[in-house]
Amino acid sequence: MSKEAIAQKAAIVDEVAEQLKESVSAIVVDSRGLTVAEVTDLRKQLRDAGIKLRVIKNKVLTRAAEKAGFEGMDDVFVGPSAVAFSEEDAVAPAKILKTFADSNDNLSIKGGIIEGEVADIDTINTFATLPSREDLLAMLANEFMSPVRDVAYALKAVADKKSEEDAA
């Protein structure tokens, strides 16, 4: 193999390692058996959520994971592998891929990295059931607003009662 080819492969490994480090979530799937239309649909769903799906050779993934400091992923990088990288939302890739896998037997989740930790299939499935960050923030805001809303209703009830008494 020429020095140029080796340098090119090393650059790809470096690029994938950097992408693994920068991503809050990287889910590895086996998409063997998916039709072109199904892959296109999956890519569109992921792209709409800001997630990149790349098909990467297992040897490149193994070396990149080691370089990025993620050990113990050799059993994940077996067979055809595609990786969904998300730099913003750790939950979105797991949700989208699990939903797609539930409706399509040809897609299987193999493992991945979530928030800098190696994640097995069970962990990824657990993440897939969590609400998104925006939903969690909305729930939190609702909980903060609940006491204020209760006070407002109580004050309104007192004001209504007072106006009824004044009218009578």
Curated annotation (Swiss-Prot):
What CDD domains does the record point to?
A: Ribosomal_L10
UniProt keyword annotations, A-Z: Ribonucleoprotein, Ribosomal protein, RNA-binding, rRNA-binding
| Example GO biological process | translation
Gene Ontology CC annotation, any one: large ribosomal subunit
Instruction: Specify whether Cell division is a keyword of the entry.
Output: no
Q: What is a single Pfam family found in this protein's UniProt entry?
A: Ribosomal_L10
Binding partners and assembly? Part of the ribosomal stalk of the 50S ribosomal subunit. The N-terminus interacts with L11 and the large rRNA to form the base of the stalk. The C-terminus forms an elongated spine to which L12 dimers bind in a sequential fashion forming a multimeric L10(L12)X complex.
Known function: Forms part of the ribosomal stalk, playing a central role in the interaction of the ribosome with GTP-bound translation factors.
**HAMAP family listed in its UniProt record:** Ribosomal_uL10
What NCBIfam families does the annotation carry? PRK00099.1-1
What is the recorded name of this protein? Large ribosomal subunit protein uL10
Q: Which gene encodes it?
A: rplJ
